[in-house]
A protein has these predicted regions:
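Flexible loop/turn segments at secondary-structure boundaries
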Residues: 71-73, 162-164, 190-194, 225-227, ...
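N-terminal capping segment at the start of a domain
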Residues: 14-28, 187-189
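Active-site nucleophile and cofactor-binding loops and adjacent substrate-binding regions
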Residues: 26-38, 64-70, 95, 105-126, ...
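Anionic-ligand anchoring segments at beta-strand to alpha-helix junctions in alpha/beta enzyme folds, i.e.
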Residues: 85-112, 195, 206, 212-215, ...
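Cofactor-binding active-site loop characterized by glycine-rich and histidine/acidic residues
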Residues: 36-177, 389-390, 419, 423
Length: 450
């Protein structure tokens, strides 16, 4: 029971067991997707993703977003098994008031959760923003011999995520910008609450994302750890954002409810939980975690600690060679504004003719932009009317020179708002977006999550 393959198998079975048990104990939740995605989740957290459980706020960590937030027990199980500050008792308290394991992941509640998800599609937009933040920070602070920012954003999305309009808006601009460090896994289980996706969903999704400018890949068996890792490696090697279709049977390996909507949004039932554990050759004990998995968690922690220590060495060398830039970096990451940021702001005398507030806003924005290097944003195709362009600064474009700061969002208000949330959550930047007030209705779901 000590080989890596066996540890992987134990971890996958543990994730499935915890997901069933937690939802059953809470008498509420979504067991089927965490069960089906256990191999993918474990591959990400144990092998592919660069992260350090002891330092969940490490600036150069890979970000992970569970866009299908209803599958939260997948993320909680992975955080626990990887050594984050989330105990087995926390998992036992799934969906209980005041617990660290709410029904959907919440950024400000649970260590290791990068963004609040639940409303489908938002996580894809958040991921676009995080990938944009990485590009901005790399252009602003990386120097020859000192690569401080070089990380990826991994997203797991469901059929429902892919149907939502915000996902298409976000995928469109991500492809246009060639955000090659954004990788989205699509859990193609062909099931929604109302039944098979045949009822509602018939387009060629891979062709759609290919048209958006993404690399598209496919893994036909979501249980195949080798195929999952190979697809991820191919994604990491491409300059385009990558969209990986993963076929999974929801609820696997439950003997009576797999591949049905019955495994989606309700407890399996105690009899089905026991039957599933028997199929897995797993103890029927609730919340069982084998002792052997301590070795797997230690491996994740050790690898993370090594990578974090290496980054700290690079940061120390950067401080010695570029002290002024390092001070700017510290301020950016802590959210501090530079000294004198509010000096010399324009003032506006009373004028009987009146001054449009958008013109005053534009003048102040440009005064701030000259002093706050992390100010990043733009308008949804209304820059001239909103006066939201920062003059003389580089735009976010695939081959732009300089530090990208102006964003031409296009007519994508919803994606703009979701990406702004991702930019803000990533840290190191101060994002903004602009449109007409009446069009802000298109942004409302993301504004609520902000």
């Amino acid at each position: 029971m000590g080989t890596p393959a066996t540890l992987d198998e134990l971890a996958i079975k543990t994730i499935r067991g915890l997901s069933m048990d937690a939802v059953q104990a809470a008498n509420s939740g979504h067991p089927g997707t965490p069960m089906a995605l256990a191999p993918l989740g474990w591959a990400l957290f144990s092998k592919l993703r660069r992260h350090d459980p002891a330092h969940p706020d490490w600036p150069d960590r890979d970000r992970f977003i569970l866009s299908c937030g209803h599958a939260s027990m997948l993320q909680y199980s992975l955080l626990h098994l990887s050594g984050y500050a989330l105990s087995l008792d926390d998992i036992r308290n799934f969906r209980q008031w005041g617990s660290l394991t709410p029904g959907h992941p919440e950024h400000h509640v649970t260590p290791g959760v990068e963004t609040t998800t639940g409303p489908l599609g938002q996580g894809i937009g958040n991921g676009v923003g995080m990938a944009m933040a990485e590009r901005h920070l790399a252009a602003r602070f990386n120097a020859p011999g000192h690569e401080l920012f070089d990380h990826r954003t991994w997203v797991i999305a469901s059929d429902g995520d892919i149907m939502e309009g915000v996902a298409s808006e976000a995928a469109s601009i991500a492809g246009h910008l060639k955000l090659g460090k954004l990788i989205v896994f699509w859990d193609d289980n062909e099931i929604t609450i109302d039944g098979s996706t045949d009822l509602t969903f018939s387009e060629d999704v891979l062709a759609r994302f290919s048209a958006f400018g993404w690399q598209t890949l496919s893994v036909d068996d979501g249980e195949d750890l080798v195929a999952l890792s190979e697809a991820a490696e191919a994604a990491m090697a491409d300059e385009r954002p990558s969209f990986i279709r993963v076929r999974t049977p929801i609820g696997y390996p439950a003997p009576n409810k797999p591949t049905t909507s019955g495994a989606h949004g309700a407890p399996l039932g105690e009899d089905e939980v026991i039957a599933t554990k028997q199929v897995m050759e797993w103890p029927t004990e609730h919340f069982f975690v084998p002792d052997e998995l301590a070795t797997a968690a230690e491996s994740v922690r050790d690898r993370g600690a090594e990578r974090y220590a290496d980054w700290q060495k690079r940061l120390d060398a950067y401080r010695a060679e570029h002290p002024e830039a390092a001070a700017e970096l510290d301020a950016a990451l802590s959210g501090e504004l530079p000294e004198g940021w509010d000096e010399d702001l324009p003032t506006f005398d009373a004028d009987p003719k009146g001054l449009p507030t958008r013109k005053a806003s534009g003048a102040i924005l440009n005064a701030l932009a000259s002093k706050i290097g992390g100010l990043v944003g733009g308008s949804a195709d209304l820059a001239g009317s909103n006066n939201s362009q920062m003059k003389g600064l580089s735009n976010f474009l695939p081959d732009a020179d300089g530090v990208p700061r102006n964003v031409d969002w296009g007519i994508r208000e919803h994606a703009m708002a979701a990406a702004i949330n991702g930019l803000a959550l990533h840290g190191g930047v101060i994002p903004y977006g602009a449109t007409f007030l009446v069009f802000s209705d298109y942004m409302r779901p993301s504004i609520r999550l902000a």
